Amino acid sequence: MLARFAAPALCVVLLAAGCSSGDDDPAPEPTGLIAATTMRGALLQATDIGPTWAAPADAADGKQLVSICGGTTTPPPVPPGSEVVAASFVDEGEKGAQTLDQTALVYGDASAAKAGQAALRAVADGCKADISVPATVTNDKSEPAYTETVEIKTLDESGWSGFAVIRHKKYEPKHPGTADTAVAVLTKSNVVLVDAYAIYQLNNASTSPNFAGDWQKLVGSVVQRVG
């Protein structure tokens, strides 16, 4: 049984930051490259997010990212040529769970980073806008039938630019529950940041009211740490 689910709103001092939709003037581009150590220090830690967050029991596969399109699609591989810096955390409880997967792909130059982001954008552009998945019961998984909507938004924050794939999953009425996911892919200089936040609610058929603000604040906190 899940043991710790705090309020859906994230309680962190860092969450004053947020991502814009491109209307604000971005900060000027830096002249130098961003180091892997800089990204390692910029990624949020459990203590930055809230007291109920912790590292997951299972370590993530460093060669794969989180799923971008959702549904039954497989997660894309990490675009080649980068040093991977990652940090993942979960907040689990009786009413649901939250997850945060942060991956920084640090390339040797800006051109390689742009190519890496383009590869991930190609995956996102192939996502279906509406998905219906029947109930699944296997030795490893039991999941009720659900529908999921997918949309892509443009992002521009503090000199970082890219996109976010926003997914809303809703389970069949006899198994009420939702899963709201945002996968942000942003590039600045030689770095591609893939930041995925998800909130899962049990016995609740409504989207979390704090979801839209929370994922933007989490991403904004990281990019503003880098500058």
How would you label these PLM feature ranges?
Residues 53-182, 210-226:
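A small/polar (G/S/T-enriched), proline-flanked helix-loop surface module common
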Residues 28-50:
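Post-signal peptide N-terminal segment of mature Sec-exported envelope proteins
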Residues 11-13:
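Core hydrophobic alpha-helical membrane-spanning segments
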Residues 20-23:
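Bacterial signal peptide processing site
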Residues 175-202:
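Short, well-structured beta-strand
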Residues 197-214:
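A short acidic/glycine-rich loop-to-helix N-cap element
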Residues 1-9:
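Bacterial N-terminal signal peptides that target proteins for export
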Residues 15-18:
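C-terminal motif of bacterial Sec signal peptides marking the signal peptidase cleavage site
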